[in-house]
Swiss-Prot record:
Protein name: Phospholamban
Gene (name only): PLN
Residue positions of covalent lipid attachment, annotated as S-palmitoyl cysteine: C36
Species this chain originates from: Canis lupus familiaris (Dog)
Key words of the record: Acetylation, Endoplasmic reticulum, Lipoprotein, Membrane, Mitochondrion, Palmitate, Phosphoprotein, Sarcoplasmic reticulum, Transmembrane, Transmembrane helix
Keyword Lipid metabolism assigned: no
PANTHER family: CARDIAC PHOSPHOLAMBAN
Listed Pfam families: Phospholamban
Membrane topology label: Single-pass membrane protein
Protein localization: Endoplasmic reticulum membrane; Sarcoplasmic reticulum membrane; Mitochondrion membrane; Membrane
Superkingdom of the source species: Eukaryota
One of the record's GO molecular function terms: ATPase inhibitor activity
Length: 52
């Protein structure tokens, strides 16, 4: 278990030390925001359908 935690921690550290280009980070943020908006819309549609 400790080994798994250590591997996970080192992987996270390695991922955070890799400097992402600004454009890639921007694209990831846009993707994440779009994904969240789509999820919220789906939830709203489900709620409306249940209420009707």
């Amino acid at each position: 278990m400790d080994k798994v935690q250590y591997l996970t921690r080192s992987a996270i550290r390695r991922a955070s030390t890799i400097e992402m280009p600004q454009q890639a980070r921007q694209n990831l943020q846009n993707l994440f925001i779009n994904f969240c908006l789509i999820l919220i819309c789906l939830l709203l549609i489900c709620i409306i359908v249940m209420l009707l």
